[in-house]
Amino acid sequence: MSNLPFTVAALYCFAPLPQYESLREPLAQLCCANGIKGTLLLAAEGINGTVAGSAGAIEKLIAHITAIPGLGEPELKYSHASEMPFHRMKVRLKREIVTMGVEGIDPLKSVGTYIAPKDWNALIADENTVVVDKRNDYEYAIGTFEGAIDPQTRTFREFPEWVKQNRDRLEGKKIAMFCTGGIRCEKATAFVKGLGFDDVYHLKGGILKYLEEVPREQSMWNGECFVFDERVAVGHGLAESDVELCRACRRPLTPQDKLSQFFEEGVSCAGCYAERTPEDRARYAERQKQVKLAEKRGANKHIGS
């Protein structure tokens, strides 16, 4: 039981939701009435999101979601935060709850074999296993599993093309995929199986469940796990980390990254310095100055973030 004040719930569920548009307003009202912040995505294929609030408020929300006709029990990962990790509450209607951009991919019909965190090490240590990090390049940069391939994708939409271009690396192998909470692997494994690969596996509950359940001394995870909120990243035991965001490009930065000559708080980092013009950096510097002034006044410290 954590003594941190905010409970963070990452959830998803694939299920036919033809009535998804009508679910938006009740969810938004419940969240706002109970001080919950974060993002929930609704689509005809299900629900996905990460939210934070008091333990009691999150319990109410999960009960509401579970009671939605046709939805069933969502895949859930809980963690905790010392501060509210979101700025506002958003409930959005989408075409997909995780955007791959490939028509006809349905994890309810075909999906990879789930591997529990306690069994994951044995699978990825097998010399006949290819381990694929299903996340984006900036996520891979601060942490991944031993021996994992980085597809060097900036978005999930790029993954299908990577698979097609790298079939020879996957042929005749066990294919083990992982992502933050599991949802990207639902579609990724369904896609790969649709190409004719049979031995396709994914980490049940994702990295978050692995870091929660597998002791550090037994872990094959190196680094931190990027999360899409103001905590930026978590480590073993889902403890908050010292990774921060570059407010110019949203890349995660380790303490080592901040030693770069190209790092300036709120203005640039080594990853984005060459991508921005002097005018851009001047604009970011002015924004950062306003952030600092707001902090001194006790106003919202996330202005411009």
From Swiss-Prot:
Domain of life: Bacteria
Catalytic-site annotation from UniProt: 179 (cysteine persulfide intermediate)
PROSITE patterns: RHODANESE_3
Limits of the Rhodanese domain: 125-219
BP terms from Gene Ontology: tRNA modification
UniProt xrefs under InterPro entries: Rhodanese-like_dom, Rhodanese-like_dom_sf, TrhO, TRHO_N
Disulfide bridge positions per record: none
Family from the record: Belongs to the TrhO family.
PANTHER family per the UniProt record, alphabetical: RHODANESE-LIKE DOMAIN-CONTAINING PROTEIN 7-RELATED, THIOSULFATE SULFURTRANSFERASE/RHODANESE-LIKE DOMAIN-CONTAINING PROTEIN 2
Name used for this protein in its record: tRNA uridine(34) hydroxylase
